[in-house]
Regions:
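Extreme N-terminal starter segment of soluble prokaryotic enzymes
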Residues: 1-4
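Short glycine-rich anion-binding loops that position phosphate/pyrophosphate groups of nucleotides
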Residues: 10-12, 76-79, 102-104
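Glycine- and acidic-residue-enriched helix-capping/strand-helix junction motifs
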Residues: 15-29
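Short Gly/Thr/Asp-enriched flexible loops that form oxyanion-binding sites at enzyme active sites
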Residues: 63, 82-91
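Short acidic/histidine-rich motifs immediately flanking catalytic phosphotransfer sites
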Residues: 64-71
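Short, acidic/small-residue loops that bind anionic groups at enzyme active sites
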Residues: 90-107
Length: 146
């Protein structure tokens, strides 16, 4: 059974409260339940972590080395400037997919660029909670080309 680490960055714990027009009314507990259900359906083991602290996310990525087969990451605001998260993703060389609930390319200009995606095999954005399920599904079957 593949093990997938699901990381959520700052303010994702505030789902259901913050900017409902962008993120919807479902809360973080609903997201976690959705992810767990998708993981079970796909036959993968999913472990979830949310942190508002960049260093905690870097540490979680580093600890994933040798323990996880894939990473689903929503770096949230760290997406746009965290070279530390990018470097951690590159260091562990675990297939990772960046996920965003909203479409970052349809929002403010500063959100259009992702620094962290360069450490990922792909990006899914704008599909709400379903983006997490799609990322899990992709990692469940992913085989590196080389």
């Amino acid at each position: 059974m593949r093990r997938i680490l699901v990381l959520n960055g700052p303010n994702i714990n505030m789902l259901g409260t913050r900017e409902k027009a962008i993120y919807g009314r479902r809360d973080y507990d609903s997201l976690c339940a959705y992810i767990r259900s998708a993981a079970a359906r796909l036959g993968v083991e999913g472990e979830l972590l949310q942190s508002n602290y960049e260093g905690d996310i870097v540490t979680a990525i580093q600890k994933a080395y040798g323990a996880f087969d894939g990473i689903v990451i929503n770096p949230a605001a760290f997406t746009h400037y965290s070279v530390a998260i990018l470097d951690a993703l590159k260091a562990v060389n675990i297939p990772a997919i960046e996920v965003h609930i909203s479409n970052i390319h349809q929002r403010e200009e500063f959100r259009h660029h992702s620094v962290t995606v360069a450490g990922c095999i792909g990006q899914i954005c704008g599909l709400g909670f379903a983006g997490y399920a799609l990322a899990l599904e992709a990692l469940a079957v992913y085989e590196p080309e080389a």
